[in-house]
Curated annotation (Swiss-Prot):
GO molecular function annotation: antiporter activity; xenobiotic transmembrane transporter activity
InterPro entries given in the database record: MATE_fam (IPR002528), MATE_MdtK (IPR050222), MdtK-like (IPR048279), Multidrug-R_MdtK (IPR022913)
Family membership noted in the UniProt record: Belongs to the multi antimicrobial extrusion (MATE) (TC 2.A.66.1) family. MdtK subfamily.
NADP among keywords: no
Swiss-Prot/TrEMBL GO biological process terms: sodium ion transport; xenobiotic transmembrane transport
Keyword Phosphoprotein assigned: no
Gene, per the UniProt record: mdtK
Function summary: Multidrug efflux pump that functions probably as a Na(+)/drug antiporter.
Domain of life: Bacteria
One Gene Ontology cellular component: plasma membrane
Protein name listed in UniProt: Multidrug resistance protein MdtK
Keyword set, alphabetical order: Antiport, Cell inner membrane, Cell membrane, Ion transport, Membrane, Sodium, Sodium transport, Transmembrane, Transmembrane helix, Transport
Subcellular location: Cell inner membrane
Membrane topology: Multi-pass membrane protein
Organism: Salmonella enteritidis PT4 (strain P125109)
Length: 457
């Protein structure tokens, strides 16, 4: 029991800064929406539309680079720290290549925006302008993620938290300057949010790079050889590990976007109730997602040390802590669901629907916690292909079709409306949780030599 208690302390010490960093990131999006809304409703809508395209594109790159964390954690655990700098260099090369692709996609996103049904031309122009300003921040964001993954792979999660809050503090005044046109800058409205956010990502990257260069604990792994050429073997391995994570993230984000589109014709009350429940559950998702990042670090580190039993302990502890957190947040959601809904909207119909959906969200949180921590465990074991196949099957083969059937057809029961999609979420996430656990069990039952050989690749 003592080893689980000790492991839980170490996991929480890693996870809490990640949680706070994620809060800062979420707050940046909230600040952009509020400040753009203060300028005009059209500008706020433009930021919302632009963000809905930015997120799938940038999260694809973000997911690709997540491969660095278990690689660095494993090298750190095995005492091969001299190889970390080379892995990080290749991470920067990969981030550079991916950022070019992301920028090309975002530059041409105007075709998607202008093809939206009945979109106002002025709104479309502002959304395109917002994206074309924001895309210059894509390299800064991805380079920052490489530096952050280096720190987190070395079990240092506090720098990411500090840089997250630095970004938030810089974002507010820079937003103000470019939205309203102060200090000789042009008045850009919602487009100014894109300029500010792009600038903030570069500030966060430069600050993180400065920390890495001056941190005593990283003296032995600094890049003293210059940038060097791309190493095709290392980059291929990072892509093999990262691509399944990137695709899983992409399909998860697009699933919720597709459901939002399918709910939109059902009416304002249904859309608002669905959005409130989804927004609140996404805030709660920060907890297990951050814990999953900590579990990846601990499992990778323990495998690097050559201890498959300690890696199992880290995995089981992460699941136990995650389930406890999910039960607490589920009870909180059920108990205060009406009060939470009233914080978003005071329309009685919207509040009633949101409160009903939050009952389903409480169940969803438990399944979601297990599946996301399961994904973190599999990343630690460098078993990333299974993450993609499990999430794709669970979300797109099981979750979305069953949600569609329950919500919009009479095939099984009378049309359930938004609640049907939430039942689909529960089916999809519960399936993912079960499949992740089965895969984890299969991996852990393999001989130690095979597990360690896979981890050392």
């Amino acid at each position: 029991m003592q080893k689980y208690t000790s492991e839980a302390r170490q996991l929480l010490a890693l996870a809490i800064p990640v949680i706070l960093a994620q809060v800062a990131q979420t707050a940046m999006g909230f600040v952009d929406t509020v400040m753009a809304g203060g300028y005009s409703a059209t500008d706020m809508a433009a930021v919302a539309i632009g963000t809905s395209i930015w997120l799938p594109a940038i999260l694809f790159g973000h997911g690709l680079l997540l491969a660095l964390t278990p690689v660095i954690a494993q090298l750190n655990g095995s005492g091969r720290r001299e190889r970390i700098a080379h892995q990080v260099r290749q991470g920067f090369w990969l981030a550079g290549f991916v950022s070019v692709l992301v920028m090309i996609v975002l530059w041409n996103a105007g075709y998607i925006i202008r093809s939206m049904h009945n979109i106002d031309p002025a709104l479309a122009d502002k959304a395109v302008g917002y994206l074309r300003a924001l895309l210059w921040g894509a390299p800064g964001y991805l380079f920052f993620q490489v530096a952050r993954n280096q720190c987190e792979g070395l079990a240092k999660t506090k720098p990411g938290m500090v840089m997250g809050f630095l970004g938030l503090l810089v974002n507010i005044p820079v937003n103000y300057i470019f939205i309203y046109g102060h200090f000789g800058m042009p008045e850009l409205g919602g487009i100014g949010c894109g300029v500010a956010t792009a600038a903030v990502y570069w500030v966060m990257f430069i600050a993180m790079l400065s920390y890495i260069k001056h941190a005593r604990s990283m003296r032995d792994i600094r890049n003293e050889k210059g940038f060097g050429k791309p190493d095709s073997i290392v980059m291929k391995r990072l892509i093999q590990l990262g691509l399944p994570i990137a695709l899983a993230l992409f399909f998860e984000v697009t699933l919720f976007a597709v459901v939002a589109l399918l709910v939109s014709p059902l009416g304002i009350v249904d859309v608002a109730g669905h959005q409130i429940a989804l927004n609140f559950s996404s805030l709660m998702f920060v907890l297990p997602m951050s814990l999953a990042a900590a579990v990846t670090i601990r499992v990778g580190y323990r495998l690097g040390q050559g201890s498959t039993l300690d890696a199992q302990t880290a995995a089981r502890t992460g699941l136990g802590v995650g389930i406890c957190m999910a039960v607490v947040t589920a009870i909180f959601t059920v108990t205060l669901r009406k009060h939470i809904a009233l914080l978003y909207n005071d329309n009685p119909e919207v509040v009633a629907l949101a409160a009903q959906l939050m009952l389903l969200a409480a169940v969803y949180q438990i399944s979601d916690s297990i599946q996301v921590i399961g994904s973190g465990i599999l990343r630690g074991y460098k078993d990333t292909r299974s993450i993609f196949f499990i999430t794709f099957t669970a979300y797109w083969v099981l979750g979305l079709p069953s949600g569609y059937i329950l919500a919009l057809t009479d095939l099984v029961v009378d049309r359930m409306g938004p609640a049907g999609f939430w039942m689909g979420f529960i089916i999809g996430l519960t399936s993912a949780a079960v499949l992740m656990m089965l895969r984890m069990r299969y991996l852990q039952r393999q001989p130690s030599a095979i597990i360690l050989q896979r981890a050392a690749r």
